[in-house]
């Protein structure tokens, strides 16, 4: 007689999640277009805003950050033409911290130009020591 075993991982995780999503591409001439497709696939994770930062060796960093859905913002070929290069990272946002009214400064990825080069960063989750880090770094 066989006995049925319960599944090792129950199937109770079938709902959409309200979390951010990150997607990156490296080594493709139009990396930002691939990132836009990846963000579209992750759209259910973040529905408030999205952003893409790309880097081109000859043009440096370029970014686009917008409120709303990926399909409404990153399908415009004129906008995507402003995001050249073989490196790109994107983020879709679902806020769990910060103010209730969305502000563009909270839309990721973040990037900065420094004396030794630039950097772009996107993260998921809350930075629990954000206030202390802000005081220390700024």
Describe each region flagged by the PLM:
Residues 1-131, 136:
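N-terminal glutamine amidotransferase
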């Amino acid at each position: 007689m066989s006995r049925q075993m319960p599944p090792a991982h129950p199937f109770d995780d079938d709902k959409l999640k309200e979390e951010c999503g990150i997607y990156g591409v490296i080594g493709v001439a139009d990396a930002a277009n691939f990132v836009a497709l990846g963000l579209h696939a992750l759209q259910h994770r973040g529905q408030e805003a999205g952003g893409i930062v790309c880097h081109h060796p000859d043009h440096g960093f370029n970014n686009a950050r917008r409120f709303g859905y990926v399909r409404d913002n990153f399908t415009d070929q004129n906008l995507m033409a402003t995001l050249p290069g073989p490196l790109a990272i994107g983020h879709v946002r679902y806020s769990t911290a910060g103010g209730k009214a969305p502000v563009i400064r909270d839309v990721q990825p973040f990037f900065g130009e420094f004396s030794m080069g630039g950097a772009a960063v996107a993260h998921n989750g809350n930075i629990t020591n954000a206030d202390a880090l802000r005081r220390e770094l700024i």
